């Protein structure tokens, strides 16, 4: 390997080294640059243009200065290797290694002969020649080791330079964001100024890299729709409660960890999208948003829903809670009588409350991918009379509830990746109608069996009662007869005798 790193393997390092000043005078022998016939280096100008196109910040003086100081060890080693010469080829190294082994073996035998014959000068000349050859072989091996270490050094240096560039690129991006933030702030100020003099019903500030929402936004009268999605908001000001007319609020894809308690004062809010944030809980006050029709809290870190979410969100039709860590639904969920669409896949649900079956308007239900946590469904699951689509895939359900056959509206069913025993696999493969028929017949058979068992028990009880009554009457009759006979029969004189 030549002292100059190949631009193909070390593009950034080659670019930086090519811009280092050279203080060493070129010897006549080094007037022609080394040329590797197997791996000729590409044109320096073309490689420089290519790397600068890919990494434009390389042309910045401060970036280049940082990189130059980071590879001082490479520059020093390169200077030494220029003096030592190119790396010996593989064959030369193998020959030197074999020759060195041969020389060491010869010298060892020679020393033994000297010890035995005590003839110190016998092979002196030969040993001197061998010592010279040994030195030459060792120098070849040492040069190969230095070049190997240099190659490792080049790899480490390239990685260092890439890290420096990435850091510079990140800083540049942050600077650009700061500039953009100033521009956004000017846009926000413009919106607020316009809204103070003119009625505004819609504001769209999505994708503006906003980090902060001014308190003054809460004073925009008549605002119906506010879109703040795809920003970098970490909080929403309490002043948002001043948007009394707000119907739709979208704060999805931000960095929100909490929602303000004042959100419960948005009594006219119908659509709330807080998906793809960092929420671990919802404020209890959200239950007071009684006009909500759609609530999307998917792709967060929720572990539960507010206890009283059901009684007050009576108009909610669509609830999206997928990709959270919810372990159970509150009992009050059964009071969401308007709910039609519920998506809760990819959570940690371990079951459904018995009140869940009160959601008689529910049409779509996705409980898939709760994995090892979800093992069964409520017995009265069949009371969800409006259910049309049901996804239970990727759970641990062994048996569908016995009332499943009464889901007359069900047209789509997915129970893949469950250890189902009831219904059996062959029935599931035939489709949703086959499953409903099987479960319906199974339910009828179970009811008939229960009725038969009940009748048998009643008959046993009736028979037992008749026998008891008969025995009682017989005992009474025997007692009466005994009493009658005892009072009217003459006494036996023999029995009356004194002993």
Swiss-Prot record:
The cross-references to SMART domains, in alphabetical order and at most eight, read: LRR_BAC, LRR_TYP
* SUPFAM superfamilies, per database record: L domain-like
Q: Give the GO cellular component terms, alphabetically.
A: cytosol
What keywords tag this UniProt record? Answer: Coiled coil, Leucine-rich repeat, Repeat
Tissue-level expression:
Widely expressed.
Q: Which PROSITE patterns match?
A: LRR
One BP annotation, GO? pollen development
User: In which ranges do the LRR repeats occur?
Assistant: 197-219, 220-243, 245-266, 267-289, 291-312, 313-336, 338-359, 360-383, 384-406, 408-430
Question: Could you say what a knockout of this gene produces?
Answer: No visible phenotype. Pirl1 and pirl9 double mutant is lethal due to a male-specific transmission failure leading to a severe pollen malformation.
The residue stretches assigned to a coiled coil in this entry are 138-187
Could you tell me which residues belong to the region Disordered? 25-48
Please name the InterPro entries in this protein's record.
Leu-rich_rpt, Leu-rich_rpt_typical-subtyp, LRR_dom_sf, LRR_domain-containing
**Short sequence motif named GVYW, residue ranges:** 431-438
| Family (UniProt) | Belongs to the SHOC2 family.
Function of the protein: Leucine-rich repeat protein that likely mediates protein interactions, possibly in the context of signal transduction. PIRL9 acts redundantly with PIRL1 in the differentiation of microspores into pollen.
* Database matches in PANTHER family: LEUCINE-RICH REPEAT-CONTAINING PROTEIN (PTHR48051:SF54), PTHR48051
Q: What is this protein called?
A: Plant intracellular Ras-group-related LRR protein 9
- Protein's gene: PIRL9
């Amino acid at each position: 390997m030549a002292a100059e790193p190949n631009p193909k393997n070390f593009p950034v390092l080659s670019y930086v080294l090519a811009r280092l000043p050279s203080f060493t005078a070129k010897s006549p022998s080094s007037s022609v640059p080394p040329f590797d016939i197997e791996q000729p280096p590409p044109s320096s100008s073309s490689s420089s243009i290519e790397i600068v196109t890919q990494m434009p910040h390389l042309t910045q003086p401060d970036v280049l200065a940082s990189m130059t100081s980071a590879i001082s060890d490479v520059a020093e080693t390169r200077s030494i290797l220029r003096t030592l010469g190119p790396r010996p080829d593989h064959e030369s190294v193998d020959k030197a290694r074999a020759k060195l082994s041969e020389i060491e073996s010869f010298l060892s035998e020679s020393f033994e002969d000297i010890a035995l014959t005590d003839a110190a000068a016998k092979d002196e000349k030969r040993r001197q020649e061998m010592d010279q050859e040994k030195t030459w072989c060792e120098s070849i091996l040492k040069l190969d080791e230095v070049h190997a270490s240099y190659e490792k050094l080049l790899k480490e240096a390239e990685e260092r330079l890439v890290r420096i560039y990435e850091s510079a690129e990140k800083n540049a991006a942050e600077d650009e964001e700061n500039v953009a933030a100033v521009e956004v702030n000017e846009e926000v100020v413009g919106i607020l100024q316009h809204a103070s003099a003119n009625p505004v019903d819609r504001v769209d500030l999505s994708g503006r890299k906003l980090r902060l929402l001014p308190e003054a936004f809460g004073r925009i009268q008549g605002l119906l729709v506010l879109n703040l999605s795809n920003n970098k908001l970490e909080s929403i000001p309490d002043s948002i409660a001043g948007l009394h007319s707000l119907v739709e609020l979208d704060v999805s894809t931000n960095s929100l960890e909490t929602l303000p308690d004042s959100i419960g004062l948005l009594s006219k809010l119908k659509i709330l999208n807080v998906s793809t944030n960092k929420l671990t809980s919802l404020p209890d006050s959200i239950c007071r948003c009684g006009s909500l029709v759609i609530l999307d809290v998917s792709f967060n870190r929720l572990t539960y829903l507010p206890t009283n979410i059901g009684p007050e969100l009576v108009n909610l039709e669509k609830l999206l809670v997928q990709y959270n860590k919810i372990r159970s639904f509150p009992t009050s969920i059964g009071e969401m009588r308007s709910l039609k669409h519920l998506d809760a896949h990819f959570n940690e649900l371990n079951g459904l409350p018995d009140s869940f079956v009160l959601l008689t308007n529910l049409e779509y239900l996705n409980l898939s991918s709760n994995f090892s946590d979800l093992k069964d469904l409520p017995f009265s699951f069949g009371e969800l009379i409006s259910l049309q689509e049901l996804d239970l895939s990727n759970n641990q359900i062994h048996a569908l509830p016995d009332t499943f056959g009464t889901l007359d509206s069900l047209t789509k069913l997915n129970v893949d990746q469950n250890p189902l025993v009831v219904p059996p696999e062959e029935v599931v493969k035939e489709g949703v109608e086959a499953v409903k028929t099987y479960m319906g017949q199974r339910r009828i058979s179970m009811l008939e069996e229960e009725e038969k068992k009940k009748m048998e028990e009643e008959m046993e009880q009736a028979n037992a009662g008749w026998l008891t009554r008969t025995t009682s009457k017989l005992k009474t009759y025997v007692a009466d007869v005994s009493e009658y006979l005892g009072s009217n029969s003459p006494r036996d004189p023999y029995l009356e005798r004194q002993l």
